[in-house]
Amino acid sequence: MERGAAPGGGKVPVFRLRGITKRFGGVTAVEGVDFELLPGEVHALVGENGAGKSTLMKIVGGLYAPDEGSLEVGGEPAAFSSPRESEAAGIAMIPQELDLFPELSVAENLYVGRRRPRTRWGGIDWGRMRREAGEKLASLGVGLDVSAPVKRLSTANQQLVAIARALLREARAVVMDEPTAALTGREAERLFGIIAGLRRRGVGVVYISHRLEEIFRIADRITVLRDGHLVKTAPASALDPDELVRLMVGRPLSEFFSRHPHEPGEVVLEVRGLGREGEFADVDLVLRRGEVVGLAGLIGAGRTELAQTIFGIRTPDRGEVRVFGEVLPPGSPREAMERGVFYVPEERKSQGLIAPFSVKDNITLSVLERFTRFGFVSRGPERELAGRLAGALSVRGGGIFDPVSRLSGGNQQKVVLAKSLAREPAVLLLDEPTRGIDVGAKSEIYRLIDRLAGEGRAVLLISSELEEILSMSDRVVVMREGRISGEFGREEATQERIMAAATGVRGPSAAVAEEEAGR
């Protein structure tokens, strides 16, 4: 079946929600929403963070009960009081944070919550269990050691285990929440192939993602939620990216990228002959005041490693970094911050934030000594700084005393950026700053980058999204296999030129490598 074709062939929906309303205290999360999933279709569910997507699917998954409205499964009325009841009805949930048991084997994870095969003497038939697990994975075109602990697998392979578990339970519907957020280009391609296989089997897939290019590639229908309300359900073929963004956030895609190029000023940061064995070599790079330099390249090109070496997380084998003309001592993030350089990591949850800490504590952590005298912290000035930066970056989802773990991905990223701005940096190294966040939050971060450049700060923007690189950069530097392979001014930079420099392939064939653009 072609993407965008009418799925289901008039069949009864796998499940259908009618007039769903869910309230939490005085807050209405979703109101009067209709949604259905047909056999063998990929139905994309999109909207900004807080639009109600997760709430709606948690009702389907048995985690929440609706306050109003009804649920049908296979044309029959249904009401789930637990996830187990939802699973028994043939609905499998694959959350972004996979619910696997890392210490258990692949085979054991596939049988969690399911009766394990028994020998005639009543013991667990481990041989049969491993064999069936291997067969189910093989049906997905995957060969894994089913005896290995899940913790040893890559994120992509853990995801395949979750999908195989759903199939072992004979799921008729699979709900995937941001399934490619942590995958490389190749891994995402493999996932798309598996989703196509699920469609051929007649399994319905609900696909939740912020990545519009993926949605238009694999979805048959798209449902848009905004502020807890249903905006529209339409065939994917009847929409385009600009229209979809307008439905999601109320303004067109053309208004998303906020870049007002400024005349670059003095050199702020200079990299000379920087190298690190096995990662990158002979890198020369210059950043000027008021300039956004995009750093493009494929997975493994060395971009993240370069940024971390500039900041001091990694130590170079050769070369030097200069800030305002003075050599920056290698291997010292503290010294880098003192000189006005700040790195915002791609992995915000594990490297950029302390999840149990409050928004305030995360923002002020890097400047706490500023408020400390004789071992005591002056809480008033600390609160004032955190509140001012949280307000300036429009951090939403709670107050500055709430745990940062409660915020959406986009708001967590704003907190990481606020922490960097607390240092008043001259140079910002931004590693995938919009990865995994919704389109509205992306727009706000683009405006922030433009504002920072307008204030005279230098920004190094690492991104795997070529549209982001092209729209936000004054210059584009390309890395390939650890070396600088190209540099383009704003007027010279095109998608084709960047991909040619990133792959070493000249001409139109370079475009086929675009899917591999990454860290």
UniProtKB/Swiss-Prot annotation:
EC number(s) given by UniProt: 7.5.2.7
Gene3D superfamilies from the UniProt entry: P-loop containing nucleotide triphosphate hydrolases
Keywords noted in UniProt: ATP-binding, Cell membrane, Membrane, Nucleotide-binding, Repeat, Sugar transport, Translocase, Transport
SMART domains per UniProt: AAA
Domain of life: Bacteria
Pfam families: ABC_tran
GO MF terms held by the record: ABC-type D-ribose transporter activity; ATP binding; ATP hydrolysis activity
A GO CC term attached to the entry: plasma membrane
Chemical reaction(s) catalysed: D-ribose(out) + ATP + H2O = D-ribose(in) + ADP + phosphate + H(+)
Lipid bilayer topology: Peripheral membrane protein
Binding site residues for ATP: G47, E48, N49, G50, A51, G52, K53, S54
Boundaries of every ABC transporter domain copy: 15-252, 262-506
Subcellular location: Cell membrane
Residue ranges the record marks as coiled coil: none
Family from the record: Belongs to the ABC transporter superfamily. Ribose importer (TC 3.A.1.2.1) family.
Function comment: Part of the ABC transporter complex RbsABC involved in ribose import. Responsible for energy coupling to the transport system.
Complexes and interactors: The complex is composed of an ATP-binding protein (RbsA), two transmembrane proteins (RbsC) and a solute-binding protein (RbsB).
Name used for this protein in its record: Ribose import ATP-binding protein RbsA 2
Native organism: Rubrobacter xylanophilus (strain DSM 9941 / JCM 11954 / NBRC 16129 / PRD-1)
